[in-house]
UniProtKB/Swiss-Prot annotation:
Pfam families registered for this protein in UniProt: ADK
Lineage start: Bacteria, Pseudomonadati, Thermodesulfobacteriota, Desulfovibrionia, Desulfovibrionales
Similarity field: Belongs to the adenylate kinase family.
GO CC annotation, single: cytoplasm
Source species of the chain: Nitratidesulfovibrio vulgaris (strain DSM 19637 / Miyazaki F) (Desulfovibrio vulgaris)
Region spans: LID: 125-164
Descriptive protein name: Adenylate kinase
Assembly and interaction partners: Monomer.
């Protein structure tokens, strides 16, 4: 089973991706990790990518796409879940063409829907427990709202990450994601159009639901 997943920062995309990975024993492939793997491993593609990164430039698609494709091809027998790529319409088309050329099927495309303001509030509402950062606490999500200023799981003190409170940085990330002309949503809609032609399946999920309700809906549609 091969899957692409889309969702804005704050939508729970990483959480749902991890649940799907565990359920179907998929390789969970994150675009940033691909760069780190190639650069750290000193591959030819990694060396080329590093030159651009060191100059502060975007790595061109003719380097990025082969990196992604190589990782997908080596993902293992159960398939993969790709997170964080593509990020625009051009990349979506190039990735699709590359998958077709390699005979790799794209079974599902998942989009987690969440209003921009809700996504921003969720990011700014995240709180970290001093005892365990994996303890879920968010002042804007009722199911995991902390008890005052202490962790809802263990009672430890809470803090907020500085970048989670930077509205400007959050806005820039969301500007890219919610752009339906040449941003990440444009990439998602490219696959939505393909699904309308019957060449893949497109799943839309209401990101305002609980983690469990979203998971249950998703797994039913993947079954």
């Amino acid at each position: 089973m091969n899957i692409l997943i889309f969702g804005p920062n704050g939508s729970g995309k990483g959480t749902q991706g991890a649940l799907v990975k565990k359920k179907y024993d998929l390789a969970h492939i994150e675009s940033g990790a691909i760069f780190r793997q190639h650069i750290g491993g000193g591959t030819e593609l990694g060396k080329k990518a590093k030159e651009y990164i060191d100059r502060g430039d975007l790595v061109p698609d003719d380097i990025t796409i082969p990196m992604v494709l190589e990782t997908l091809k080596g993902a293992g027998p159960n398939g993969w879940l790709l997170d964080g790529f593509p990020r625009n319409m051009v990349q979506a088309q190039k990735l699709w063409d590359a998958l077709q050329a390699e005979g790799l099927k794209l079974d599902y495309v998942i989009e987690i829907l969440l209003p921009r303001e809700v996504a921003k509030n969720r990011i700014m509402g995240r709180r970290l427990c001093k005892n365990d950062n994996n303890h879920p606490n968010n002042i804007f999500i009722d199911a995991i709202k902390p008890d005052g200023d202490v962790c809802r799981v263990c009672g430890g003190s809470l803090s907020a990450r500085a970048d989670d409170q930077d509205e400007g940085a959050i806005g820039k990330r969301h500007d890219i994601y919610y752009n339906t002309e040449d941003g990440t949503l444009a990439a998602a809609y490219f696959y939505k159009d393909l699904a309308a032609k019957g060449v893949t399946k497109y799943i839309e999920l209401d990101g305002e639901g609980s983690i469990d309700s979203i998971k249950d809906t998703l797994l039913k549609q993947l079954a």
